[in-house]
């Protein structure tokens, strides 16, 4: 049985609103003042009583009354306490977005009065919110704040909670340190007399032990936690029954596993229902109850989709949440439903499995794109200042070849501002989205020339759905590991120009598409919904057949477009021959004669070069892109717009480019270097030297914050189409960032391409005047294939790809 550890575990932190004043470090201002009026004491008692009976709505109402009273008395310390009580209610009800805003307000007040103890507690609460949605970077940063507060205080009241939170963080990282932190937190909770927290710590340690395969210790600590709850907090027993159900499943005792899981479900307590439904579905599947299992797993998907509406509306949290949901809830249902469809021929399960694949895949980008509009309207002015500071911090990180603490801190600040700006927007739009995802609605939007080919890669077997306007066909293909090997070998052979690329391409084509029905094969427009290693496959160079010594490539028959998800398809706006904005041939080095003799400070790009001896002058690592100037000119000429802006040489500056975007170009063409010194997810578009002699750049974070509504974007630099493939979220990189910025489609490269005059782009823009981007790329690739020159080889034309939902 597949389970995921440390997800959506309720760590309710009531500590700020009910802590004794004796917990304050000697010398700090007395905290007892906020209980100092009869009204405040009455409110606190009412809130605690409501909380203990599980009436969280009433508890939150009482805490809000207390907060209003504290505001009236100008008592910031009391305001902090009540805000944390409100946040705890919100966290327990899985209202993470609201909890974030409440906690950030509490943090602001705590900073104003210099209360380190409150700040430490708030850091623990914030980490809880971030861990719930798997935003690990944000959680680590606020936990570091909590540890800093812990080191400056003597036995602060939040110490047990902090230690357990650190255990959760290390558990998710699986770095071997979780067990020690859990044990410390459990011991501290016992010393503080907090039996509820002690039981929760035992639960989490039990989950960690289950994940390590230590069933004996897991059983011991989970049962210990259950006995504690039986004695001190029986209303929380559903949390123990949930874990006991998981434990019994691991032990193969399916009857007991089902009994405990049913107990937890019937209790309707704090254990998340979608996790329990998923757990029972897997138990029923193991017991041979296919119908019951499918019903439970299907409901788990529906419940988790509603849970997603409460995820923090910041791009990092949305990506993490989709990745987490894909990892167990969606995958379990998809595999069960697809298997049932193939076993019985029941089209209902084939269709529902397809919808589940595409719902989770599309949600992350769609929600992030929607939020991008909200951010621009609602983020404070300091957001852009913070973004600029992050850019400077990234410069330092690049110079050191490693991320730095300042970058992490600033990214957290941006995420918090994004989340606050998106509140009230995500839920409304997401609810509309989920109401519109029926298969009929989707299929009616397809053209008669199109087929959507949607892949799901599984450990045991994978699946391919071929969906046209009238049909949906499901087929089983090889497991992910086999496909990974075949794609890797094929890509390497094509890139290197080796002759075995033909045989490997034909084999991979048969593996992926050999079972396609005639209707799908006949469709000229292929829309690919991908995951994992498939993002790296040069589909255009797949070999459909060899006959009489002649090789037929897929590109000869089909245009290929990678889509962010089948549920995100749209029609490309018809803007005519609109404005063309191009950037190319920047000045990358002070040695460039165009820079001028009077300006010779070191280039930023030189920072990547380490001199062999002290005092040796650094030389640039990146050469001039001489051919990019011709590429820009021929591309613009073949597009034929009456409004063309080409930023070359000294004009190829970041600020000039961003300024021109405000004029709404239809085409954005970037013929620049693109570098990935710190990993595929965060890249840098390198512009020319600025006034200080340092190169300027745009990161993927910067790009996602731009606005290019409806524009077509071409990035012809090295490997611009690469990124970090994330389950349930897609490829995280420049192509996704431009789509978040509003681009209708993006042309990018899978590997470095030889610098030339841009012949393929001259052909591409000529065809784009009368064709879709995917078809224009196909025709230009055929032009290269038939050219009889060195450009005819797949290693030249195959790495170009079109990504986007508009067609």
Model regions and ranges:
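A domain-level signal for caspase-like cysteine endopeptidase catalytic cores
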Residues: 143, 222, 489, 532-534, ...
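Amphipathic alpha-helical protein-protein interaction segments
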Residues: 290-553, 568-605
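An often Trp-containing, charged/polar helix-loop segment at the C-terminal end
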Residues: 756-807
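Conserved alpha-helical positions within TPR/SEL1-like repeat arrays
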Residues: 41-52, 78-92, 117-132, 157-171, ...
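Tetratricopeptide repeat
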Residues: 59, 65-66, 99-106, 139-146, ...
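Catalytic cores of nucleophile-dependent amide-cleaving enzymes
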Residues: 666-763
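Residue-level detector of the short coil/turn that links helix A to helix B
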Residues: 54, 94, 134, 173-174, ...
């Amino acid at each position: 049985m597949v389970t995921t550890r440390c997800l959506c575990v309720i760590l309710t932190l009531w500590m700020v609103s009910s802590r004794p004043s004796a917990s304050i470090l000697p010398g700090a201002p007395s905290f007892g003042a906020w209980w100092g009026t009869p009204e405040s004491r009455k409110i606190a008692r009412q809130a605690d009583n409501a909380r203990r009976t599980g009436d969280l709505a009433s508890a939150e109402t009482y805490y809000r009354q207390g907060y209003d009273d504290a505001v009236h008395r100008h008592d910031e310390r009391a305001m902090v306490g009540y805000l944390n009580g409100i946040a705890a209610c919100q966290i327990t009800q899985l209202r993470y977005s609201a909890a974030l805003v409440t906690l950030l307000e509490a943090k602001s007040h705590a900073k104003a009065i210099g209360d380190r103890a409150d700040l430490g507690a708030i850091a623990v609460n914030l980490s809880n919110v971030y861990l719930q949605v798997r935003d690990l970077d944000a959680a680590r940063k606020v936990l570091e704040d909590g540890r800093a507060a812990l080191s400056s205080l003597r036995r602060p009241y939040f110490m047990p909670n902090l230690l357990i939170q650190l255990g959760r963080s290390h558990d998710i990282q699986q770095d071997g340190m979780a067990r020690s932190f859990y044990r410390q937190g459990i011991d501290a909770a016992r010393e503080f007399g907090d039996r509820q927290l002690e039981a929760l710590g035992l639960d989490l340690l039990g989950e960690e032990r289950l994940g390590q395969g230590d069933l004996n210790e897991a059983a011991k600590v989970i049962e210990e936690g259950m006995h504690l709850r039986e004695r001190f907090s029986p209303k929380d027993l559903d949390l123990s029954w949930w874990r006991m159900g998981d434990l019994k499943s691991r032990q193969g005792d399916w009857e007991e596993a089902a009994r405990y899981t049913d107990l937890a479900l019937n209790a309707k307590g704090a254990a998340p229902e979608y996790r329990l439904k998923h757990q029972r579905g897997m138990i029923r599947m193991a017991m041979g109850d296919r119908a019951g299992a499918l019903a439970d797993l299907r409901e788990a998907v529906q419940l988790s989709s509603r849970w997603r509406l409460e995820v923090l509306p910041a791009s990092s949290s949305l990506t993490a949440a989709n990745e987490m949901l894909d990892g167990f809830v969606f995958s379990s249902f998809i595999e069960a439903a697809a298997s049932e469809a193939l076993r019985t021929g029941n089209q209902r399960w084939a269709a529902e499995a397809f919808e589940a694949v595409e719902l989770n895949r599309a949600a992350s980008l769609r929600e992030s794109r929607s939020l991008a509009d909200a951010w621009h309207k609602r983020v404070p002015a300091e957001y852009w200042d913070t973004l600029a500071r992050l850019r400077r911090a990234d410069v330092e990180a690049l110079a050191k070849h490693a991320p730095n603490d300042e970058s992490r801190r600033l990214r957290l600040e941006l995420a918090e501002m994004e989340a606050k700006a998106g509140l009230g927007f995500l839920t409304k739009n997401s609810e509309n989205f989920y109401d519109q995802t029926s298969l009929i609605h989707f299929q009616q939007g397809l053209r008669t020339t199109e087929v959507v080919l949607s892949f799901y890669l599984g450990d045991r077997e994978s699946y391919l759905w071929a969906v046209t306007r009238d049909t949906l066909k499901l087929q089983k293909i090889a497991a992910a590991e086999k496909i990974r090997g075949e794609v890797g070998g094929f890509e390497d052979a094509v890139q290197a120009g080796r002759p075995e690329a033909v045989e490997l391409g034909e084999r991979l084509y048969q593996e992926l598409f050999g079972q396609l029905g005639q209707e799908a094969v006949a469709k000229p427009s292929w829309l690919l919904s991908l995951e994992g290693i498939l993002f790296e496959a040069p589909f255009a160079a797949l070999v459909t057949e060899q006959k009489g010594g002649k090789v037929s490539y897929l590109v000869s028959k089909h245009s290929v477009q990678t889509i962010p998800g089948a549920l995100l398809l749209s029609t490309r706006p018809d803007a005519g021959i609109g404005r063309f904005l191009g950037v190319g041939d920047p000045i990358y080095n002070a040695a460039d004669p165009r820079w001028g003799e009077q300006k010779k400070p070191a280039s930023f790009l030189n920072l990547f070069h380490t001199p062999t001896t002290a005092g040796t002058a650094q030389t640039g690592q990146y050469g001039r892109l001489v051919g990019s100037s011709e590429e820009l000119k021929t591309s613009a000429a073949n597009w034929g717009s009456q409004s063309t802006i080409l930023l070359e040489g000294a004009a190829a500056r970041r600020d000039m480019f961003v300024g021109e975007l405000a004029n709404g170009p239809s085409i954005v063409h970037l013929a620049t270097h693109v570098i990935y010194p710190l990993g595929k997810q965060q890249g840098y578009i390198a512009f020319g030297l600025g006034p200080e002699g340092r190169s300027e750049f745009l990161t993927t974070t910067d790009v996602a914050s731009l606005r290019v509504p409806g524009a077509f974007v071409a990035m012809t630099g090295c490997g611009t189409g690469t990124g970090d493939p994330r389950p349930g979220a897609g490829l995280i990189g420049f192509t996704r960032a431009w789509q978040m910025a509003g681009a209708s489609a993006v042309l990018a490269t899978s590997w470095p391409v030889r610098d030339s005059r841009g012949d393929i782009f001259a052909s591409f823009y000529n065809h784009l005047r009368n064709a879709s981007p995917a078809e224009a790329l196909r025709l230009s690739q055929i032009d290269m294939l038939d050219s009889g020159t060195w450009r005819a080889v797949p290693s030249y034309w195959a790495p170009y790809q079109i990504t986007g939902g508009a067609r």
